[in-house]
Amino acid sequence: MTLDLSLLPDGGASWLDASGDHADIVLSTRIRLARNVDGYAFTGRARDGERLRVLAQLRDAVPNVPSLARSVLLRVDEMPSTDRLLLHERHLVSKELAGLDAQHPVRSGAAVFLADDVGVMVNEEDHLRLQALRSGFEPAAAYAAVERLDRELGGRVPFAFHPEFGFLTACPTNTGTGMRASVLIHLPGLVLTKEIAKVLSGLQQMGLTYRGLYGEGSEVVGNFFQISNQTTLGRSEDELLDHLMRVVRHVIEREEEARRVLLRDAGYIIEDKLWRAYGTLRYARSLSFDEAMNYLSGVRLAVGLKLISGLSVYTLNKLLIFSQSAHLAYAEGRTLTDSEAGVARARFVRQALATEGGSQG
């Protein structure tokens, strides 16, 4: 592995610090703006030379963009697959930019600029994906950061824009504002009370969609759902953001009510189930990714319900991300087999819980 995480601002993991609102329920908020450079074919139709020129144009502009003044450029197209996977696991690049499946091989010119609180993916589905990632439920702060970046970068790079349709994008659902606002939210209460289907159906009726831990194409694991807007055309950024905020606040309220119902109607059963999850994590010698996510979901719920004390949400956030396969390989300094990763994952979790152990709340 060649990636040096010490070069990244805060290791690219400041969004894990549990500092935002409702951090026990909402892991993170992301605002992303899709932009294309005028005069070039969209990334999927562009030749290698065009994509490299897009990257060169952005690289030339960066010194004059205050939001990116201290950014680090990572050439994703020159990285080994494990490094690309690590960036994806850390939510710094998309699966498509990282080229992690046969449908989306890594493209020439694929890169990412990472700054303190914003980033720009280059040559993903669109030429540029501007993004801000925040801890907890912080859509206003995330939007303010990415809007500032958009304004600064737009003054240096000509974006493809149509007076009637707005910002032009490779996928028609992004045309208009080009904005995708998403919240990664933990909903075990609604799952356990079997209310989750109603909530998810309601999201779709209100023009929102849900996905798994890593967005489009990913499965729901550990009771984490990514809620986001579906389309952008015909609505302003403020309207899209306000709608998402109102709906997510309602979902948070529903989750909090479900947790109260669980404690009231099945207190001992739930407490036993969650402490069993903690015990497994504390002493298991091998854990698959899905096992770890599901047990961590239980412990996270227990911490939220104050059944377990002395264990921070920040630690749980780190366990969620850093116990994935590429992070384990990075820590070990070599590629791991599935069985080796299971052993390394269990050891990593045990050590973290031994350092910051939970006690009865």
Annotated model-derived regions:
Residues 186-189, 195:
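Structural signature of FAD isoalloxazine-binding scaffolds in flavoprotein oxidoreductases
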Residues 166-183:
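Conserved phosphate/anionic-ligand binding catalytic regions in large, soluble enzymes, centered on
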Residues 1-164, 179, 193, 198-361:
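Long, Pro/Ser/Thr-rich low-complexity/intrinsically disordered regulatory tracts in eukaryotic proteins
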